[in-house]
Amino acid sequence: MKFAEYERAVAETDILDSQDLVLPMLGLAGEIGSLAAQYKKIQRDHTGYRAFSDEVREELGDLFWYATALARRCNLSLEEILSDNVRKTRERFLRPATPPPHLLFDDSAPPSQQLPRSLDITFTDSLVEGKGKSPVQTVRIYRGNNAVGDPLDDNSDDDDNYRYHDVFHLAHMAVLGWSPVMRSLLKMKRSTDRDVDRIQDGGRAIAVEEGMTAYVFSMARAHSFFSTAAAIPAEIVKACQAMTAHLEVSRRSAQDWEYAILAGYRVFEELTANKGGTVHLDLHARTITYSVPRSGDAEGE
């Protein structure tokens, strides 16, 4: 039986109030409780309880009935719900080891306004006098011998290494092909297209990326900065997608975001452990990798 046929057939048996959402929800909760009760029975009598499979089949059928009733009251199609769930779970749990190739957002822009397809950025970490009561640990980033952006410290009472957070923008650039922050710092805004310059590369997009990066960092602290994680909590990925829903990066998938976040925090861990180093980006391969500091890098250039 197809799901659409099932939905039509059980609709005739739905005698609950058509506006009431509570009863279908309570029904779902009740069926979950019944399944748990069946599990308890088989745990108590492993060999003697022979009705387990039949009872589970019936409880699952009732669970589907209540799920369909709830979907109907929310004007949702169970078939569409399940189709979306298949896409989401395959994307989340069947993630290839490396991200597949994709088109870059600025492929049609003049070369001078395209993000560099290959890039090395060096992070230097040094103590700077005069920024506080005590010397402050400060990071500068360089492209070759040229400084990029301003010196950054943690701006926090805690030494949490946020001064290295530009690595997350670089990960967005490498894996997503997107970073309004890095596009601005590298002076590669798409100024020949006024709307793209204003919307995709403008101040709001920059603020969104900075805010999103700070949010993910605050969540990462509770997860040991994802140092042992093979996946990113789904709510973090959903928040990133929600914050960027009006921007071109909305075309990237949850899987893409997961690649970018994991890659960024992997390199962040290496940068902080070694107090600097060089980060290598390849936008075609969608990779961000790390090299240990050269002699003198930790003292600045």
Positions of PLM-derived features:
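Flexible "arm" and connector segments at domain edges
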Residues: M1-L60, F64-E301
